[in-house]
Design a protein with these regions (language model features):
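Hydrophobic h-region of N-terminal signal peptides that target proteins for export
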Residues: 15-24
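An acidic-aromatic
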Residues: 57-106, 163
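A short, Trp-centered hydrophobic/proline-enriched beta-strand micro-motif
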Residues: 32-52
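Cleaved targeting-peptide boundary
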Residues: 24-32
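Solvent-exposed strand-loop boundary residues in beta-sheet-rich modules
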Residues: 48-50, 90-92, 159
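Gly/Pro-enriched, hydrophobic low-complexity segments
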Residues: 115-187
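Short hydrophobic/aromatic-rich beta-strand segments that constitute the beta-sheet cores
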Residues: 42-44, 65-69, 84-87, 131, ...
Length: 187
């Protein structure tokens, strides 16, 4: 009986060590992939409190994002470092927001995204790598298990909105035209 207990303890210990090693390997591979990225172009589906929006974005590290929404307002979002502008082209109106406390900044800055990868709790499925990071705000980041591409994130923003953002990368490391991420002037 004692032999069986020792045998199962050894098997359990080997299983735990292999799991930790696999997790470290996944994180190392994602880190390598992120370090090679300077920019991505992607399409997205965004779900905020039950409302779905779709569009396409250009993301350039660090801190630059431009998204065009496929909606009737012809909404355009531009982030350049810590400034955010949302323009509704149909109505020719632009709204400006501070985002300095937004958990969304964790995605726009590669060093913060790498911190999530290194410190986040890893969960694996057949298709997705899920990293859960608890800091001031909870953020969950998703990566494709095969390609290690960023697939999306889930956050609760500073206004307590549940935001689920899924993306499909179209291109990597493109160079965008100068002025692409210019914040529109105040009207």
């Amino acid at each position: 009986m004692l032999v069986n207990v020792k045998f199962f303890r050894k098997i359990f210990l080997v299983f735990i060590l292999l799991s930790v090693n696999l997790s470290a390997n996944e994180k190392r591979q994602i880190t390598k992939q992120l370090n090679s990225l300077n920019s991505i172009e992607f399409t997205f589906d965004q779900l905020i409190n039950g409302k779905t929006e779709k569009g396409s974005c250009l993301l350039e590290f660090p801190g630059k994002l431009k998204c065009n929404y496929f909606d009737d307002k012809k909404k355009e979002l531009v982030i350049n470092n810590k400034r955010l502008a949302i323009t509704q082209k149909r109505y020719n109106k632009t709204y400006y927001y501070p985002i300095s406390k937004s958990p969304f900044l964790n995605i726009l800055y590669k060093d913060k995204l790498l911190e999530i990868v290194q410190s986040g709790e890893l969960e694996l499925t057949d298709q997705i790598i899920k990293l859960i990071y608890l800091d001031n705000n909870a953020i969950t980041v998703f990566f494709d298990r095969k390609t290690l591409d960023l697939k999306g994130w889930k956050i609760i923003d500073q206004y307590n909105n549940n935001i689920n953002f899924s993306l499909n990368i179209i291109a990597k490391n493109d160079i965008f035209k100068e002025g692409t991420f210019t914040i529109p002037k105040i009207n």
